[in-house]
Amino acid sequence: MAVIQFIQGVNEDVIPDVRLTRSRDGSTGTATFRFANPKVLEAQSSVKGNITGMYLIDEEGQLVTRDVNARFVNGKPQGIEAVYIMQSKEDWDRFMRFMERYSEDNGLSFTKANNS
């Protein structure tokens, strides 16, 4: 089972919008995750701990990014944006294996962008 966590041990139930970019030679890439009203921002979640990063966890292990930012509207948290950077083809392949598992577990689909 593939899960996303912001506080270790607490699974995030909100499904993110994920945008991928990749260099032309395939050596690097970026995944931007946008969560609208994630569970971790609810008041009772703060009792469980602080957000220390975004953890992508599956049977192979975990991928971690510390590039996590909250989005506020009128002083209240409304969303989270996290950026995961892949610095090699191996990192990209590992990330895609995680996303395949996460997609299967959550009924997501992949839509390739047009090159126009």
Curated annotation (Swiss-Prot):
This is Photosystem II reaction center Psb28 protein. It is found in: Plastid, Chloroplast thylakoid membrane. Part of the photosystem II complex. Pfam families: Psb28. One of its GO terms (biological process) is photosynthesis. Keywords: Chloroplast, Membrane, Photosynthesis, Photosystem II, Plastid, Thylakoid. It comes from Guillardia theta (Cryptophyte). It is a peripheral membrane protein. Belongs to the Psb28 family. GO terms for cellular component: chloroplast thylakoid membrane; photosystem II. Its main location: plastid. The gene is psb28.
